[in-house]
Curated annotation (Swiss-Prot):
PROSITE patterns referenced in this protein's UniProt entry, alphabetically: PHR_CRY_ALPHA_BETA
GO biological process: pyrimidine dimer repair; response to UV
PANTHER family, A to Z: CRYPTOCHROME, CRYPTOCHROME CIRCADIAN CLOCK 5 ISOFORM X1
Function, in words: Involved in repair of UV radiation-induced DNA damage. Catalyzes the photoreactivation of pyrimidine [6-4] pyrimidone photoproduct (6-4 products). Binds specifically to DNA containing 6-4 products and repairs these lesions in a visible light-dependent manner. Not required for repair of cyclobutane pyrimidine dimer (CPD).
Enzyme Commission designation: 4.1.99.13
Superkingdom in the source lineage: Eukaryota
Distribution of this protein across tissues and organs: Expressed in siliques, flowers and leaves. Not detected in roots.
Biased composition annotated in UniProt, kind: Basic and acidic residues: 539-548
Protein name: (6-4)DNA photolyase
Keyword flag Manganese: no
Conditions for induction: Not induced by white or UV-B light.
Entry similarity comment: Belongs to the DNA photolyase class-1 family.
Amino acid sequence: MQRFCVCSPSSYRLNPITSMATGSGSLIWFRKGLRVHDNPALEYASKGSEFMYPVFVIDPHYMESDPSAFSPGSSRAGVNRIRFLLESLKDLDSSLKKLGSRLLVFKGEPGEVLVRCLQEWKVKRLCFEYDTDPYYQALDVKVKDYASSTGVEVFSPVSHTLFNPAHIIEKNGGKPPLSYQSFLKVAGEPSCAKSELVMSYSSLPPIGDIGNLGISEVPSLEELGYKDDEQADWTPFRGGESEALKRLTKSISDKAWVANFEKPKGDPSAFLKPATTVMSPYLKFGCLSSRYFYQCLQNIYKDVKKHTSPPVSLLGQLLWREFFYTTAFGTPNFDKMKGNRICKQIPWNEDHAMLAAWRDGKTGYPWIDAIMVQLLKWGWMHHLARHCVACFLTRGDLFIHWEQGRDVFERLLIDSDWAINNGNWMWLSCSSFFYQFNRIYSPISFGKKYDPDGKYIRHFLPVLKDMPKQYIYEPWTAPLSVQTKANCIVGKDYPKPMVLHDSASKECKRKMGEAYALNKKMDGKVDEENLRDLRRKLQKDEHEESKIRNQRPKLK
């Protein structure tokens, strides 16, 4: 029988269900939760089982190379996130092997694979971490129904988050809290605050008879159809539980930094040593337990005399994650504008050329372009950098739909998370949660206050590496002689600005004001016809304004 090592004084209760199956083994299905520490599904699967099957299913639609995509990767994910996932799986496999087990990797549609496994193996339990994402909600119903029909006990604990979103919604009268402060008030203290977390094992049950199922090792990128040189500048962040725990240990070793962490004061231009923990991709894949992270932070707060508090503290960032998970779980069509009761209905522009220029880092604004190039190369950038490019695309300059920006982030970010990504895009486009649309990030001055020399821009946009610092954020203002000396002619080597920020932001504010007025007038019940009428009005107003500008006498 395996032994458990625990790290806190009280017990974690599993609430087992009586099994009807005659098998003596368990199947643990890994999806997220790619870790050994604080993994209730793994703990329960291993208890009282003669053998255990740890399974991960590679979905070809998510993992295999798609040459038609705008960046290296599959049809669903960029290669950086796929690489991070493979590293996480290899690390998990290594940890399981040290405990007398291994990861059994399958390829195919996950629901079909799980049913085949249950048909082939005599198991009494199917264990997997509960997932609130719509994709897994639909998939899990099918798998649970089949398992239950054959007498297999299903254990699916909530362990990806601190709170069970369904419980928060129930406590709030059947609706999710729509503000951060109201969420904190309803949520209270998580149950893990005083729970013991199983952090390690001395051994795990061996794998039983595999039968006739085709099982493989964790594949390499090359085996999935990717080339070594497909992306020269890989993300510097390595996947896996081992790396997550190392990064956490290093981050929290500086208690003063943890105690004084204040989100708005981070430096978005810091890239050699990011001004934050970069724990988000490890939380996204469950390489790090959010509950263990929470306990570590609480222990530090107890040891220091003074510390920052939510929403700006490090703990506050963890609770923002909980807020978006809860809101997303309780809001139908959370990932869309249409049919989403908490989302403002806004007649966004549709301009594929502008979207592509923003996506590819070719807007003509070096601060914006450097951020997007970092995203393309690393799959990550600082949260304030994300704010800048999201604002620029939507309500700040281009007035393009937040869903289109969301899709780019969803593909490229290594920490792309369905609830958080959609929530942040609604927030930053002033479609929900945040409504002060007159507050806009300048694509020129915002980055300059953190990095006046433009080191960040020079790193990610080497075409501008020799541009004098007084022109690095506005290279189009440099005299031609300066551009020539810097080997960067604007309009030839680097694009001209696609819009003029001052006039574009003014126009965006006007459009947002009109859209807000319509939403207020219709009490949030804006339909397609209302949006079409407003779009026509805005286009007419824009045309008239353009005529007036062209009729003004030009200064000689």
